[in-house]
Amino acid sequence: GWAFTLGKDKPVENYQQPRNIFAACGGASIFRRSLLKETGLLDENHFAYLEDIDLGYRARIAGYRNVYVPGAVVFHAGSGTTGTRHNKFKVDLSSRNNVYLVYKNMPWFQMLLNLPFLLLGYFVKILFFARKGLAGTYVKGLGKGIRLSLSAKGRANRVAFQWKNLPHYGRIQLELWRNLLYCIRA
């Protein structure tokens, strides 16, 4: 998984139409009560970073849509609390939560289908963070994510696969592949 911000630092004119998105930023989203009753609230295991993607992912699995609304205006300072964009705290938690997000939301067949892309993404991020002196922090975070996923606490919140949601998983998979192509072209 690799979360990215749609339209960041791009002309606003290109984003004037409502459109479906995978998940919304937690600092800029509104959820229906019915969705939260069905999917649950924010997962405390995430604490910070990717908790919004987790909730959006669970909504998608349950068949809900996440929609970008261009008329909504939100002022949100990303990483406002932790300071810099890349610091040990954020890199550690983000990498941990990335692994947990995949484990929690993807059924085994989808994890296997995406494993080559996930491993490549983790490798690219190791190289990226090596240039910033944070590769060790990133790798330790990945290890923490694996341990969290395998713990009783992590397994307790894993989304149970239900056959009725198979079409939703199919749509999610197509979107993941489309987003992969978007990232490659960007």
Model-derived regions: residue spans:
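Acidic/His-rich active-site region of diverse nucleotide-sugar glycosyltransferases
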Residues: 1-47, 53, 62
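Conserved active-site beta-strand element of glycosyltransferases/polysaccharide synthases
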Residues: 30, 48-50, 56, 65-70, ...
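Membrane-proximal envelope and lipid/glycan-remodeling enzymes
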Residues: 67, 91-93, 183-186
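Nucleotide-sugar-dependent glycosyltransferase catalytic core
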Residues: 75-96, 129-137
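C-terminal structural cap/anchor segments
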Residues: 105-107
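Short alpha-helical functional segments enriched in proximate histidine and acidic residues
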Residues: 101-102, 145
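Non-catalytic, C-terminal membrane-associated alpha-helical segments of glycosyltransferases
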Residues: 111-186
